[in-house]
Curated annotation (Swiss-Prot):
It comes from the Eukaryota. It catalyses: a uridine in tRNA = a pseudouridine in tRNA. Residues 538-577 are annotated as: Disordered. Its EC number is 5.4.99.-. Pfam families: TruD. It is an enzyme of class 5 (isomerase). GO terms for biological process: pseudouridine synthesis; tRNA processing. One of its GO terms (molecular function) is tRNA pseudouridine synthase activity. One of its GO terms (cellular component) is nucleus. The keyword Membrane does not apply. NCBIfam families: tRNA_TruD_broad. Belongs to the pseudouridine synthase TruD family. This is Putative pseudouridine synthase B0024.11.
């Protein structure tokens, strides 16, 4: 599978023979902790720590006593408003009989300023209704204390969930649009991950209260800031990974390879998970989008959903209905729960059922962080092929024709880590480089040019212009672990604990490897340099079933294969971004 996506070379100058192993056998075998721009590594706390923060930390919001009270508000009404601020209860009705427009306006202003937006006013026929929080009729009007920064940043910790699904689910519960939830990037699904997220004008208490509603997701660590989280603005990710079922005689060989890996790094390929494992790859869908063949792109997305578990209410069931009938409204009605609003297919069916065009489905119905993945996948495929050609023709050392991140020739003190290759698209600094030339040749085979991407930049977040050819795995650590049972937990998870060190013994051998990568680099590609094996999802799943036999599939693998209401997979690739 790797070779069809351009992953053909290695950074090591020695021939690498494959070492069989199992990756992501248990969710906690693959832990991803986002590293912020200031190099803070986001923690994955114990369930107790998360639950203690749930709804227990109150907003640091107090009554603004200095706000002048209008003469039209009585002391009795003021006392009722103060009481309502302190405790939730029935709304307070402020009578406005015979009051002027300016007086009524002053009441709204007074309540908003004195109670920092916690109390909400609504104009009714018999007066002004004041309630604690948003009522159904006022929930779209979000009053906010201007002295409080409008962006609430918080950490999401999730297990076996797509980032896109988790964000859309949180958006639904918070009653905000999915594009209002911002992240630095998308994290792996079959893993335990932590990442920073932001949402506009939502109180900390409201966010923490979600912990009672979410399964396999925890939110915590709220902080108000002026600006939202920006895509790609973090430093990278910290990985803690377990490779299981290693051959008994592989320990010395892997130790030697890890020492080499520490010095040479690895080729910065885009991993196979970027391209998916369905009948139509995400790169093929991306190619259709770049060609503006919107109908083909939509139909490929929907066809990809059909191999899933076809139980009633599932995405696969609805996709099959749409394929057979062409009736988007009928197909959309087959979805249940979060499948209707937190999946790409659900968004598409909803758009079509309301009269949207094929283009609307791609450019509007699918959230930007999700739709961008398709075009990025096509760019990634082209980049991988060019990177392989570069290593095959010039080796791993700096060559005179190499260029750096600015498109200029490299100096005499440059290392292989300084080599950059452009991504497809108009890129003036790299014009004339071998990278730009080879990319144009590959695009021409698909009927495209570099300018084909220009009009897509804004709608598909095509910001990155180049990518380093080699990457160093920083703060590398490793240790070998013995264990006795194939399902022994060897790392702490979101709600599980690893077996004690005293019990880490037995006939089975595993490698725990930890390292930090810059944003956009793939841990599975780094592991490939060590194991010499295809570390992609399909290859690892096949290896897992072969090792234990179809009758011994773990519960996690069975759920992964069938699909589950709790997982609600988006059928998109995940990126170690």
């Amino acid at each position: 599978m790797e070779t069809e996506f351009g992953l053909t070379e290695y950074a090591s100058e020695h021939t690498i023979t494959p070492v069989p192993c199992l990756l992501k056998e248990m969710y906690s075998d693959f832990i991803v902790q986002e590293i912020l721009a200031d190099h803070t590594v986001l923690a994955i706390p114990s369930p107790d720590v998360v639950l203690e923060s749930t709804g227990s930390k109150k907003e640091d919001i107090e009554i603004e006593e200095c706000v002048a009270k209008p003469d039209c508000i009585s002391e009795e009404t003021l006392a009722a408003l103060n009481d309502r601020f302190s405790t939730k209860g029935d709304p307070v009705l402020v009578k406005v009989d015979d009051l002027s427009k300016e007086d009524r306006k002053s009441i709204h202003h007074f309540i908003r300023e004195r109670y920092a937006g916690v109390l909400i006013t609504e104009t009714k026929e018999d007066g002004i209704l004041v309630s604690h929080g948003h009522t159904k009729s006022s929930r779209k009007r979000k009053l906010w204390d201007e002295k409080v920064p409008k962006e609430c940043h918080f950490t999401i910790c999730k297990e076996n969930k797509e980032t896109s699904f988790a964000c859309q689910l949180i958006a639904k519960f918070l009653n905000v649009g999915p594009n209002n939830i911002r992240t630095h990037g998308i994290k792996d699904k079959r893993a335990v991950t932590s990442q920073r997220v932001s949402v506009t004008k939502v109180h900390e208490r409201t966010i923490l209260d979600l912990n009672s509603k979410l399964r396999g997701i925890r939110v915590f660590g709220c902080e108000y800031k002026d600006d939202p989280v920006q895509m790609g603005a973090h430093w990278g990710n910290r990985f803690s990974i377990v490779l299981r079922s290693l051959p008994d005689d592989s320990e010395q060989l892997l130790h030697q390879r890890l020492e080499t890996f520490q010095n040479t790094g690895f080729i910065n390929y885009f991993g196979t998970q970027r391209f998916g494992s369905r009948s139509s790859t995400t790169a093929e869908i991306g190619l259709a989008i770049v060609k503006r063949d919107w109908e083909k792109a939509v139909k490929m997305i929907m066809t990809n959903a059909m191999p899933d578990h076809l139980g009633y209410g599932s995405v696969g069931y609805a996709a099959k209905c749409f394929s057979q009938t062409g009736d988007a409204r009928k197909a959309f009605s087959k979805l249940k729960g979060a499948q209707a609003f937190a999946t790409v297919e659900g968004n598409i069916l909803k758009c079509l059922s309301k009269g949207g065009t094929w283009q609307n489905c791609i450019t509007e119905a699918i959230p930007i962080q999700s739709r961008s993945l398709y075009v990025h996948a096509y760019q990634s495929l082209i980049w991988n092929k060019v990177a392989s050609r570069r290593v095959k023709e010039y080796g791993t050392r700096v060559h005179e024709s190499d260029v750096g991140a600015n498109g200029f020739s490299l100096g005499e003190h440059a290392t292989h880590y300084d080599i950059h290759i452009p991504l497809p698209g108009e890129n003036l600094p790299f014009e004339g480089s071998y990278g730009a030339k080879w990319i144009s040749e590959l695009l021409e085979e698909d009927g495209l040019t570099q300018s084909s991407f220009t009009a897509l930049k804004d709608r598909f977040s095509l910001g990155e212009s180049s990518r380093c050819l080699f990457v160093e795995a920083k703060e590398l650590k490793w240790k070998f672990i013995r264990y006795g049972n194939a399902r022994d937990l060897l790392q702490d998870g979101l709600q599980t604990r690893a077996i004690p060190e005293a019990e880490q013994k037995g006939p089975l051998l595993a490698l725990q490897i930890q390292f930090s990568l810059i944003s956009g680099s793939y841990a599975t590609v780094a592991l490939r340099e060590v194991t010499g094996s295809d570390m992609g999802k399909k290859a690892m799943r096949d290896a897992s079933f072969k090792t234990r036999g179809d009758d011994e599939k773990t519960e996690e693998n069975v759920l992964e294969e069938k699909g589950s209401d709790d997982a609600n997979e988006l059928n998109l690739v995940s990126e170690d971004q």
